[in-house]
C-alpha cells in the first residue's frame, strides 16, 4: 500500500507518511488552521535518507464551491 505526504504552501515541513485519505484530511485541516488556501499531496518515495514526493498534486480552496479542488 502506498503512503502519501504533503505540505501546505509557505510551510517548511512535510507531514508524516500515511494513507491518502488521512493525509488529505490532515492537510485540509492544517491549511485552514494556517490560513493557507493551497496545499500539495503526493506519493512517498524513499530516497534512502528521508523521502521525496512523486505525482504531486496541488489543491486550492475554491470559495464558490466551498471545497478543495485539484488545480492543474
Language-model regions, residue ranges each:
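Short aromatic-glycine-(Arg/Gly/Cys) micro-motifs in beta-strand/loop hairpins
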Residues: 1-12
Amino acid at each position: 500500500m502506498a503512503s502519501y505526504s504533503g505540505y501546505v504552501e509557505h510551510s517548511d515541513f512535510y507531514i508524516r507518511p500515511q494513507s491518502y485519505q488521512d493525509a488529505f484530511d490532515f492537510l485540509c485541516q492544517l491549511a485552514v488552521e494556517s490560513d493557507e488556501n493551497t496545499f500539495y499531496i503526493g506519493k512517498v518515495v524513499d530516497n534512502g535518507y528521508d523521502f521525496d514526493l512523486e505525482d504531486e498534486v496541488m489543491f486550492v480552496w475554491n470559495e464558490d464551491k466551498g471545497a478543495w479542488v485539484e488545480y492543474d
